[in-house]
């Protein structure tokens, strides 16, 4: 346990963080320097995507629970694993279809030259989780979704709109 505590005191480059823990101005995740949040939603379908990203990779941890969690790459954030870092975190509606949003953000990060360097390859680490919002009986136009997944497009918009000023409440994932 002490080893884990010491690991989390180090930044991505293995240096001790110079940031001292203190309450932020707004008490939001974006009070942490470099962290940004973006949302996008499609109100016609009733779904959305939220992207949390940073200027640099950031420390993150996860505890997945429930009978049918929809996740991608969250195992790398569990305390017993060695990575504990992410380039972005994606939260999306769309149930399993919403996991497309993670791939879009990974593509955008790679285009921005952000990610874990493996030789000449850049591998952005983008864990994500989805919620079930596919209430088919409430959405008679739901079959239109299957022609082209809207979650990649929503993820693109959320990533590109990420900043320190973001809407609070039912926006993005969970709109």
Per-range role (PLM):
Residues 2-175:
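Alpha/propeptide regions of enzymes that mature by internal proteolysis
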């Amino acid at each position: 346990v002490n080893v884990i505590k010491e690991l989390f005191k180090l930044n991505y480059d293995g240096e001790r963080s110079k940031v001292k823990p203190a309450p932020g101005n707004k008490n939001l995740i974006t009070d942490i320097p470099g962290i940004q949040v973006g949302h996008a939603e499609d109100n016609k379908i009733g779904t959305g995507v939220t992207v949390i990203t940073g200027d640099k990779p950031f420390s993150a941890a996860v505890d997945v629970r429930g009978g049918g969690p929809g996740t991608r790459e969250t195992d790398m954030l569990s305390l017993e694993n060695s990575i504990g870092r992410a380039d972005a975190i994606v939260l999306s509606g769309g149930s399993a279809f919403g996991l497309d949003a993670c791939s879009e953000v990974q593509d955008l990060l790679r285009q921005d030259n952000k990610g874990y360097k493996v030789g000449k390859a850049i591998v952005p680490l983008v864990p994500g989780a989805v919620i079930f919002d596919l209430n088919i009986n409430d959405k008679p136009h739901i079959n239109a979704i299957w022609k082209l997944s809207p979650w990649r497009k929503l993820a693109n918009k959320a990533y590109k709109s990420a900043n320190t000023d973001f809407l609070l409440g039912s926006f993005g994932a969970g709109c």
